[in-house]
A protein has these predicted regions:
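Intracellular juxtamembrane helix-capping segments at the cytosolic ends
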Residues: 110-123, 312-326
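Structural signature of the two symmetry-related core transmembrane helices
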Residues: 72-86, 165, 264-279
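C-terminal membrane-cytosol helix-exit motif in multi-pass small-molecule transporters
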Residues: 150-151, 165-185
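Helix-loop boundary and gating motifs at the non-cytosolic
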Residues: 2-51, 200-207, 212-224, 228, ...
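Helix-to-loop junctions at the C-terminal end of transmembrane segments
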Residues: 57-70, 154, 249-261
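A late C-terminal transmembrane helix in Major Facilitator Superfamily
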Residues: 329-348
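Cytoplasmic helix-loop-helix junction between adjacent transmembrane helices
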Residues: 102-137
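C-terminal transmembrane helical hairpin of 12-TM major facilitator-type secondary transporters
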Residues: 263-316
Length: 348
């Protein structure tokens, strides 16, 4: 376990920068869309571009990694993500932003697949849940930090977009300078969706439904909070709580999944998430009624924290569960397949 973590520090640091930029960007675009008076339909359309790209990228990434390797793919798509965010500040239009979000989605799914296949290659069935949970802690913790950067400058200025680009570019440094060798699969075996389903029907179906949930939460949370008249600081707090509570949950739930049937842990977490998501909606509607607004917001925060605690660790559990049933030379294809199904659920 310690050896795996020591050999993966560059990947963890690089992904930390990537996710910090992603968290900042997600909130920034949602709030900027409201300030530009995009309609709710236009905003939803624009933000959905990310998952269209996610869906497209997942279908092609195994072949790209097989041809040029993990490090080059990480570097290339990090550079693309860094470039794309700058164009948002120049061309403020829902359709243009949709196309840019498609490119961002392609970039991110390629980066995720590189990172997750790298970690799966380094870990074993005995510690895979714990390793992936630490990875997810870093991801969601970084997202939380990035979301607080929304207070850096007004979303109407160009400076926040430049900062997102700078942070994304910084992710290249540890990856390109590491002495640790990336995975060296002699051959990355293809894996059709049918093969993936045969290997892990539970993992594939779970990935689809997880995509439907997380796409709505991460793309529209800032928009929803803005519509409830939350201040920029309050929006930062809500999005930060989403990420940090999910980060805190990763390791204990991942550790539990290494000790017990991962499927039961996923099912239990799903029920918890459903209950507290419903409570969050009920409490948020109370804010529009006469009464103690501060109490309503506090209850909203608490129920939302527990929802995040239950829901955000699920993808690492799904990935670990699926990889328990396949050989190492199929990790890249299986990871990309799960990302593909996740993207399909996200745009459905």
């Amino acid at each position: 376990m310690n050896k795996v973590l020591k050999n993966s520090w560059a990947l963890f640091l690089g992904m930390g920068f990537i996710m910090m930029a992603y968290g900042f960007q997600s909130s920034l675009l949602g709030v900027r869309a409201v300030e530009e008076e995009f309609s709710l339909t236009s905003t939803g359309f624009m933000m959905s571009g990310y998952f269209v790209g996610y869906f497209m990228g997942a279908a092609t990434i195994p072949g790209i990694i097989s041809k040029v390797g993990h490090i080059r793919v990480f570097a290339a798509f990090s550079s693309l993500a860094s470039l794309v965010i700058l164009v948002h500040s120049v061309l403020v239009n829902p359709f243009v932003w949709f196309l840019l979000r498609v490119l961002t989605g392609i970039s991110m799914v390629c980066i995720y697949t590189v990172a997750e296949s790298w970690l799966n290659d380094r870990s074993s069935n005995k510690n895979r849940g714990s390793v992936l949970s630490i990875y997810m802690v870093i991801l969601y913790g970084s997202v939380g930090i990035g979301m607080f950067l929304l207070n850096f400058s007004s979303p109407k200025n160009f400076q926040p977009f430049i900062l997102v680009s700078v942070i994304t570019s910084a992710a290249l440094l540890p990856i390109l300078l590491t002495k640790q060798k990336p995975p060296t699969f002699k051959k990355i075996k293809a894996m059709s969706l049918r093969n993936l389903y045969e290997a892990s029907p539970f993992g594939m179906v779970s990935s689809f439904f997880y995509g439907t949930i997380q796409s709505a939460v991460f793309t529209l949370l800032a928009v929803y909070a803005t519509s409830m008249n939350f201040t920029i600081l309050e929006i930062s707090i809500v999005t930060f709580l989403l990420a940090i509570s999910g980060a805190i949950a990763q390791f204990p739930i991942g550790k539990i999944s290494d000790l017990y049937d991962r499927r039961k842990v996923i099912i239990f977490s799903t029920f918890g998430a459903a209950i507290f998501a419903t409570l969050s909606i009920i409490v948020s509607r109370q804010m529009y009624l006469p009464g103690d607004l501060a109490t309503s917001k506090t209850l909203f925060y608490i129920s939302f924290i527990i929802f995040s605690f239950c829901s955000l660790p699920m993808f690492s559990l799904i990935l670990a569960h699926t990889n328990d049933y396949i050989s190492k030379d199929k990790f890249v294809a299986a990871g990309a397949g799960l990302q593909f199904v996740f993207g399909l659920g996200a745009i459905s």
